[in-house]
Regions:
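Helical "lid/coupling" subdomains associated with nucleotide-phosphate turnover
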Residues: 1-124
């Protein structure tokens, strides 16, 4: 974990303007899964996930819980996708580190991504 944290430190130093960021937006994947687990959402519902605000305390709680569970136990969490059960801990470790280091108290969950932005810009 300390090797990953060192790498994250390096990446954050290289991102222009990262220190001045005021809002953390997390896209899909780990962040959406963490939100679903926090909500207790067994069946995916984009409307409940999109724009959900995950507090740092919730992120750390979900991380601690998942990190102490076996794969089988992780799969019992409402919202945990089978394909994500093996990789979620790494993604959560990154999210926790970024939130702590950058001082974010919450992460805004977005189910939109760069492709949505590209389509919207072409329609404008």
């Amino acid at each position: 974990l300390s090797i990953a944290e060192g790498h994250i430190d390096d990446v954050l130093r290289e991102v222009p303007g990262a220190a001045a960021a005021r809002t953390l937006v997390g896209l899909a994947g780990t962040v959406s899964c963490a939100a679903a687990i926090e909500i207790g959402l067994a069946d995916y519902d984009r409307d409940r996930i999109h724009h959900f605000r995950l507090s740092r305390a919730a992120v750390e709680d979900v991380f601690r819980t998942l990190a102490t569970e076996t794969r089988a136990e992780r799969l019992e969490n409402p919202g945990m996708e089978e394909a994500r059960a093996d990789v979620i801990i790494g993604g959560m470790a990154i999210l926790v580190k970024v939130m702590r280091q950058m001082g974010f108290d919450e992460c805004l969950v977005s189910e939109s991504d760069i492709l949505d932005g590209l389509v919207a810009s072409q329609q404008a």
